[in-house]
Curated annotation (Swiss-Prot):
It comes from Pseudomonas entomophila (strain L48). This is DNA mismatch repair protein MutS. GO terms for biological process: mismatch repair. This protein is involved in the repair of mismatches in DNA. It is possible that it carries out the mismatch recognition step. This protein has a weak ATPase activity. GO terms for cellular component: cytosol. Belongs to the DNA mismatch repair MutS family. Keywords: ATP-binding, DNA damage, DNA repair, DNA-binding, Nucleotide-binding. PANTHER family: DNA MISMATCH REPAIR PROTEIN MSH1, MITOCHONDRIAL, DNA MISMATCH REPAIR PROTEIN MUTS FAMILY MEMBER. ATP binds at G613, P614, N615, M616, G617, G618, K619, S620. GO terms for molecular function: ATP binding; ATP-dependent DNA damage sensor activity; damaged DNA binding; mismatched DNA binding. Residues 794-816 are annotated as: Disordered. It holds the Pfam family MutS_II.
């Protein structure tokens, strides 16, 4: 479309604007509709399921188009944003009555998934984050912005692995990366990844724009002055936010420097397996958050989600939260606070919309109600003696002047938008009241005029009325129109009627319509001025909102502690993880029978538990509940256990369950091995590691060998490890690894049917119960019977060269009777395996040796 002269004036105007936003859908305001043209129309018609048509011609071709009513915009925007689309809103800013040629239009806002602020487009209980990334293979700068709250963070991260784990944690809906990065990098595979010009990330420009935004000389006060990569990313984010919002951003007041060392790190697999806030099916039911979130406000739910996804290693913060929960439980004080907190609502996002100058009348009404509830809440907070709660109370103000202003200004139940007025109270502004009175008295004038004209003309069917297109009129039936007086001027002909206007009615119309339009303009001006007044108080209001959100989360955790029977964990310096009567917080809520609680003990004498037992016996539940108890402790929450004593952990790893990564071309076994490799490379003696059925995705010998070697390596790393397996050969590990112990989930058989007891007991399992589980799953009886025959034969098979793998220590429970898989290996492989010095082998040498062993089979 380089030659615009061939187009009509309207399309020339359209293309000048469209060329500035080639990759976004443009909604072009024409009267009461937003019209969409050309390729945008084809795409929008398909996505929105609306009719695609054509509008005249331009440059010799018909124009594909579709449209939506202007008052239905929000619903269509919501659908497009959920589909990941961005939309440019182009409004008429000129006056059609005075315009020569097309009415002047401008882009007034750009809607993207990461920069939306409209309540209708947002999930109220989820952060809506946009991130920007700058760096190379070794070091990355990451900036994250929530435009709906003003939260703005930066950090620098070493390596792709840590970066991808962090991106999984924050889960941004948009991710901005430099356009000069190579194609196909891991970050670009995330949904919402968008390339931006390299100069958008310029570090010097970024530093200047950030200092200007925060009105500071430098960034030292934010602790990020030397994070040049993160500053470049933050500058890109700030520029993108200003570009889309087309206004100042006064609610963005500071940068917060986050450090991965301050947090318990969970990789993508661990977050998925633990189902913190999203279950394995992609929903929210039966997640940890679904059980522990009874927050009164949406802003508190979002904060709790952030806590769950960013557990802390800061003992000072964790103990302050624990003390706060104890205080709120004392005398059930949380019960008094929660109804008052509910009155506060989501003022965090309301304040952001005020800062963006797009707050709606109902936002201000909700803020008015929230400010009105603050004095009573402040009185209740004054009774809380816990130091952290006292700090929150000190931050939370009452703002009587603002509360009074909003009470005087906004009617009790305002309309959704300011567009048609009717928002401000009578008495708030005398000039507005006068204009409205002039407009509203029109009704009585028309009644009086109709009565006078009927008397003057003798025409009983005469009516006086008004419509938005033709204004005021006097209507007569067609048969009586010829009897109209001479001062009646014909205005409109209808089927069966004629409409007229008189000089008197015309004079009144000019006065009334002028008063109405002037009243609307006055009300909009006053509304904008009200927003500016609130913007002047934005900083303390935002601080209060943050404090109230945290108070809500802590009150919620106190309520959950009482009603879910949670107890306060103790953090100790001694390396340990001891749990008495631990429970799975989610599973126990969905069971119809009592949950079987279990103990766990890991310390300097025992760092790994080999867990055996039948399928469905509870091994995975036992492991997951341990991880969730540790995680809940690291957000400052009480935990589902009678007693819990632990030291700080640095990471939580899970290798539980796998599926094919078809898009990535990886098999189930490859996914499993990738997760295992990540654990073996990154686990430390402060890590919690859950390993479930490692090695099951390949041949028996390969799988057992890999599981054995992985377990030995984790024992040597001294990581807190729960290692569930069906390879009973691994139960001899305690004989060679002093930090390893056996436990099992017990079960019993009755009348050839299995009964799961779910108790964790010392020692290895006595048998696998695999056939009983298969029978429970509905495997045909004839197959079960045949399997029993095969099992009996296999269990009695004895080969001449069978030898024990390791001698049994005195007092050690008998290893369960099961065919020894290693016993059938040819002698050369056994001999080679016995000569290996595993401590001196590199990972590469270990893999090569495994291949050599396999070739000897």
């Amino acid at each position: 479309m380089s030659d615009l002269s061939a187009h009509t004036p309207m399309m020339q105007q359209y293309w000048k604007l469209k060329h500035q936003h080639p990759d976004q859908l443009m909604f072009y305001r024409m009267g009461d509709f937003y019209e969409i043209f050309y390729e945008d129309a084809k795409k929008a018609a398909k996505l929105l399921d609306i009719t695609l048509t054509a509008r005249g011609q331009s440059a010799g071709q018909s124009i594909p188009m579709c449209g939506i009513p202007f008052h239905s915009l929000e619903g269509y925007l919501a659908k497009l944003v959920k589909l990941g689309e961005s939309v440019v809103i182009c409004e008429q800013i000129g006056d059609p009555a005075t315009s020569k040629g097309p009415v002047e239009r401008q882009v007034v806002r750009i809607i993207t998934p990461g920069t939306i602020s409209d309540e209708a487009l947002l999930d109220e209980r989820r952060d809506n984050l946009i991130a920007a990334l700058l760096g190379d293979e070794r070091l990355f700068g990451l900036a994250v912005l929530d435009i709906t709250s003003g939260n703005f963070t930066v950090q620098e991260i070493k390596g792709w692995e840590n970066l991808l784990a962090e991106l999984e944690r924050i889960n941004p809906v948009e991710l901005l990366i430099p356009d000069d990065w190579p194609q196909g990098l891991p970050a670009e595979k995330r949904p919402g990844a968008r390339r931006r010009a390299p100069w958008d990330f310029d570090r010097d420009t970024a530093r200047k724009s950030l200092c200007q935004q925060f009105a500071t000389q430098d960034l030292k006060g934010f602790g990020c002055d030397k994070l040049t990569l993160a500053i470049g990313a933050a500058g890109c984010l700030l520029g993108y936010a200003k570009e889309t919002q087309r206004t100042a951003l006064p609610h963005l007041r500071s940068l917060r420097h986050e450090r991965m060392d301050d947090t318990v790190i969970l990789d993508a697999a661990s977050r998925r397996n633990l189902e913190l806030d999203i279950n394995l099916a992609g929903g929210r039911d039966n997640t940890l958050q679904s059980v522990i979130d009874r927050c009164q406000t949406a802003m508190a739910s979002r904060l709790l989600t952030r806590w769950l996804n960013r557990p802390l290693r800061d003992l000072k913060v964790l103990k302050a939260r624990q003390d706060s929960i104890r205080c709120l439980l004392d005398g059930y004080r949380f019960e008094k606070l929660q109804p008052q907190l509910k009155e506060i609502g989501d003022i965090e996002r309301i304040l952001a919309r005020i800062g963006l100058r797009n707050a709606r009348p109902r936002d201000l009404a909700r803020l008015r109600d929230a400010l009105g509830a603050l004095p009573e809440l402040q009185n209740a907070m004054a009774e809380l003696e816990a130091p952290h709660l006292a700090r929150l109370a000190a931050i939370t103000g009452t703002y009587p002047e603002l509360a009074g202003l909003l009470e005087r200004a906004i009617i009790d139940n305002p309309p959704a938008v300011i567009r048609d007025g009717g928002v401000l109270k009578t008495g708030y502004d005398s000039e507005l009241d006068e204009l409205l009175a002039m407009s509203e008295n029109a009704g009585q004038f028309l009644i009086d005029l109709e009565a006078r004209e009927k008397a003057r003309t003798g025409l009983a069917n005469l009516k006086v009325g008004y419509n938005r297109v033709h204004g005021y009129y006097i209507e007569l039936p067609t048969k009586q129109a010829e009897q109209a007086p001479g001062d009646y001027i014909r205005r409109q002909t209808l089927k069966g009627a004629e409409r007229f206007i008189t000089p008197e009615l015309k004079a009144f119309e000019d006065k009334a319509l002028s008063a109405k339009s002037r009243a609307l303009a006055r009300e909009k001006m006053l509304y904008d001025a009200l927003l500016e007044t609130l913007i002047g108080h934005l900083a303390p209001l935002q601080d209060s909102a943050a404090a109230l959100a945290e108070l809500d989360v802590l009150s919620n955790l106190a309520e959950r502690a009482l009603n879910l029977d949670l107890n306060c964990p103790s953090f100790v310096d001694e390396p340990c993880l001891r749990i008495e009567q631990g429970r799975h917080p989610v599973v126990e809520q969905v069971l119809t029978t009592p949950f079987v609680a279990n103990d766990l003990g890991l310390d300097n004498s025992t760092r790994m538990l080999i867990i055996t037992g039948p399928n469905m016996g509870g091994k995975s539940t036992y492991m997951r509940q341990t991880a969730l108890i540790v995680l809940m402790a690291h957000i400052g929450s009480f935990v589902p256990a009678a007693r819990c004593e632990l030291s700080l952990v640095d990471r939580i790893f899970t290798r539980i369950g796998s599926s094919d990564d078809l898009a990535g071309g990886r098999s189930t076994f490859m996914v499993e091995m990738s997760e295992t490799a990540n654990i073996l490379h990154n686990a430390t003696d402060c890590s919690l590691v859950l390993m479930d059925e490692v090695g099951r995705g390949t041949s028996t010998f390969d799988g057992l060998s890999l599981a054995w070697a992985a377990a030995e390596r984790l024992a040597q790393l001294r990581a807190y490890t729960l290692f569930a397996t069906h390879y009973f050969e691994l139960t001899v590990l305690p004989e060679s690894e002093p930090l390893v112990a056996n436990v099992h989930l017990n079960a019993t058989e009755h009348n050839e049917r299995i009964v799961f007891l779910h108790h964790v007991l010392p020692g290895p399992a006595s048998q696998s119960y695999g056939l009983a589980v298969a029978q429970l799953a509905g495997v045909p009886a004839v197959v079960i019977q045949r399997a029993r025959e095969h099992l009996g034969r296999l269990e009695t098979t004895s080969l001449p060269h069978e030898t024990p793998i390791a001698s049994k220590s005195k007092g050690e429970p008998d290893v369960p009777h099961q065919s020894d898989l290693f016993a059938s290996l040819p002698h050369p492989a056994i001999e080679k395996l016995g000569k290996l010095d595993l401590d001196d082998m590199t990972p590469r040498q270990a893999i090569e040796t495994l291949y050599q062993l396999k070739n000897l089979l």
